[in-house]
């Protein structure tokens, strides 16, 4: 049984734009799967459909053999709890401390009223501190999040996802706004999490060299259709030219020197 399974998935937006077309795709446990393609190819739509930030129009998406497409109420909450999310623009509460932001990854485990009052048990604080240590910013735990650099803020968001104790992490262009050195640090963090904790990573990346360096698997989308799915070792320049529908530009190839 695949960890994530797309079955004949289609997404059509209200304006008629086709986001995804007839997607059949399996993601296996422990994959570091990188989604590539032009802007507007459907990368974010595919990624965000996994935890239903975007609902699909038809088809089904299964997580561990169970339909998240059909899940409702508490069942949906329990399934989402198992899926961490990292965004391009961090999505942090800027005036809150680093620790408080990471603790927000635990909200799915407790009643809403406790979370509003900030009543996190000691075990949650231990998990949050462990997550911060794993991404090497434990020493910043009591600082305001908006006092830190972009790279450090992205590491907070990774720690928040880790504190959630997910089986899957979705990362939507997590390094798009970062400089090359910070990009490498963040990508190294994600790869380490994947290899050491066995957490499946499904990530959108703009730069082809990053996809090849870090991905075990490349998923290519063009105009909402799946045009390549295979090991990174098989993703040749010709394959990428086909995914993009043209030769790659220099600023699409190189992310980290």
From Swiss-Prot:
Residues 4-248 form the ABC transporter domain. It catalyses: phosphonate(out) + ATP + H2O = phosphonate(in) + ADP + phosphate + H(+). The keyword Transport applies. It comes from the Bacteria. Keywords: ATP-binding, Cell membrane, Membrane, Nucleotide-binding, Phosphonate transport, Translocase, Transport. NCBIfam families: ABC_phnC. Part of the ABC transporter complex PhnCDE involved in phosphonates import. Responsible for energy coupling to the transport system. This is Phosphonates import ATP-binding protein PhnC. The gene is phnC.
């Amino acid at each position: 049984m695949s960890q994530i399974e797309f079955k004949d998935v289609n997404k059509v937006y209200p304006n008629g734009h086709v986001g995804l077309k007839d997607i059949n795709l399996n993601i296996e446990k422990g994959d570091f799967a990188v989604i590539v393609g032009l802007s507007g190819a459907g990368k974010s739509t595919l990624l965000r459909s996994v935890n239903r930030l975007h609902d699909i129009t038809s088809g089904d998406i299964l997580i561990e053999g169970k339909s998240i497409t059909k899940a409702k109420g508490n069942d949906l909450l329990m399934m989402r709890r198992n899926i961490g999310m990292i965004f391009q623009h961090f999505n942090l509460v800027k005036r809150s401390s680093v620790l408080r932001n990471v603790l927000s990854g635990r909200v799915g485990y407790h009643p809403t009223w406790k979370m509003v009052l900030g009543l996190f048990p000691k075990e949650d604080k231990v998990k949050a501190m462990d997550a911060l240590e794993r991404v090497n910013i434990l020493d910043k735990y009591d600082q305001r999040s908006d006092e830190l650099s972009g790279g450090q803020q992205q590491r907070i968001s990774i720690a928040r996802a880790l504190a959630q104790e997910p089986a899957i992490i979705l990362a939507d262009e997590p390094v798009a706004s970062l400089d090359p050195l910070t990009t490498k640090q963040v990508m190294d963090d994600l790869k380490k999490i994947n290899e050491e904790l066995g957490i499946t990573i499904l990530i959108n990346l703009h730069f082809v060299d990053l996809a090849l360096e870090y991905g075990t698997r490349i998923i290519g989308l063009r105009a909402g259709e799946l045009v390549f799915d295979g090991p990174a070792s098989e993703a040749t320049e010709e394959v990428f030219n086909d995914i993009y529908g043209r030769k790659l530009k220099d600023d699409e190839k190189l992310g980290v020197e």
